[in-house]
Structures are given as C-alpha cells and as structure tokens.
Amino acid sequence: MQYMILRKADASTEAGELPGPALLAAMGAYNEELAKAGMLLGGEGLQASSKGALIRFSGGKPTVTDGPFTEAKELIAGFTMVEAASRQELMEWLQRWPKEDADGNTSLEVREGGCPGGVRGVAAKGAPALPEGFRRFMILLKANDRTEAGIVPDSEWLGRMAQHNDEAARAGVLLMGEGLKPSASAFRMKFTRGKPGVMDGPFAEAKELLAGFWVIQARSLQAAVDWALGYPFPFRETEEVEVEIRLLYEAADFAAA
C-alpha cells in the first residue's frame, strides 16, 4: 500500500533555515534504509511558504495571493512517498525517524495514497535533469468537506483530470502526482524529545488537510501558478477550493549555502 508521509512545517522551516549537516546525514541514512527495504518511492523538501502562492477558487473564480501563508495553521515542510505492506510496518519505521530533526520534536502526518475517484497517479522517475532556468514546484490541493467525505466528481470531470495529467506527463511538465484518501484512514505521529505519540484520523480541520498533489517543472512561480489555474481541480467550479503552490529545494540550494 502506498503512503505519503508529511513532515509539518515549524518556525525554523518557515524562516527558510536550511537543515544542518547532521540532519542531512541522518535523513540521508534513513532514506537509504527505506530504499534498501524497497519502500522508498520519492521525497522532497519544500521551501518556506514565503516563496509560494495560494489560489482560492470561489464559484469558479480564482484569487491568487503571494506567500507567506500566515492564516494557515498547518503547513508542509517536506514529504516522503513509501510503499508499505501494512500500516503497522510503516509505524515501526516512523518510530525510528531521525532525532536530529527538530531536536526530536517533529510532527508527521501519514496519509493513504490513491485518488478516491480512480484517477491514476504519476510516479516519480528519479531526480530529473531540469532544463536551464527551470525549478520544480509542488501543487497542493487542500481538502474540503466533500473530499473528506469521499465524494468524487462525475466520470466526465474525472476524465478531464486524467487527460490533463497524461498530457502534462507526456510533455515533461508533470513529474509526479497522486491523490490522497480521506483522513479517516490517516494518523499523526508527534515526537516530543524523541518519543512518539500517535493520533488516529479522521481530523476535523478539513481545510488544513491535503486531498492530492502534483510536482511540476516551470520557469517561474508565475508559470507554476498559471499551470495550476488551468488544472481541472475537483469542485473548483462550484465549491470553495484552495491550492498551494510551493517551491521545492534542489541540491544546488544546499551547495550554495
């Protein structure tokens, strides 16, 4: 079963502070173990929301706001996609999350992958060789009451989403993407001084949750926003829908620090 591990943002990540050598080494070793176990599917770090943008659709009309997202209570600083035989297996792995991360005071949210409407995801194909001047951006579809209830658009709309994904992937724009099941099957793991505590879903704050994501390459934040404005997100014509656009870290960002 596929899962998405969401590493919640904190004051340090929102300030744009880069992880130190100890954390980079610890996370690298942890991910290497996941890969050796055949579980690691991909993962990325997100830059501070000040380098992103937020789109709000209301009655089909979009409003774009530049970051930072000061109103949001729950932001994402990174994610890891894994394949696990069971929830219990994954929980055992997560209990070994590197204590170097936030001095052992990290918050994780684990979501079951897979679009409830059956739209096929786009799997990552390793680190892409980005064209000169391009960056990668993550498009985060926020949940709402409909997605949390497992309500999906009609087959025609789902077909539009699938076609858009296929065309963007063939064009080399869409690098990765997946829907997420409602939070009823999710859990959170909060570490306090390295000791984990677990809370099962569902989680009440629907607008702070994710319903799906896409990773694209674009020349600029504006180009990424334009791509998102053209995407047929579920219920964008009839409901209040929010989409975050976040800049991803590249290896060069750490080398330049």
For every predicted segment, state its role.
Residues M1-A257:
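Conserved, structured core segments of small domains
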